[in-house]
Amino acid sequence: MKTRTQILNEIKTIEKIGGVYKWYMTKEGAYQLGIPLNETTIKNGLHLVYVGLSKDMRMRLQWHTGDKHRPSSIKSGTLSVLRQKLNTLLTGRWDGKEEVDQFMDQHMKVEFEYSDNYETLELREIQANRLPLNARNNPNFTEFRRELSKRNGQAKRNSL
């Protein structure tokens, strides 16, 4: 598992091929954000909270770890979905880049694997784990995700 800073420092070593990534969070970080952790997968003392896929792992990890939260990204909705959700829970807005960076540095780590079958692998991971921050194909944490979706929309409006 790697920290946000490690990913940014090693970004050129990450291949531009498909794969699946998994974001883990400390119990303290989840508590701070109000993220439910019941029955989540635990690895190295961290809780698995989000799984994603990409056809270009370098680009996707750079996006999640270093997105600039530009007004144009906020307006168009192209801000990293993970960062949207973290920002919503931290500040009620989408323009708090520093807050998200600091939170990720203190409370989150990511691991990834390359795969030609990344779509199938991601679906398998979502179905096999309880993931509070995943929306698509996720039957778990319905109430939390519904409330987060409402708050996320308001956070975007608060940032424009």
Predicted regions and their residues:
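Boundary/linker segments flanking structured domains
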Residues: 1-160
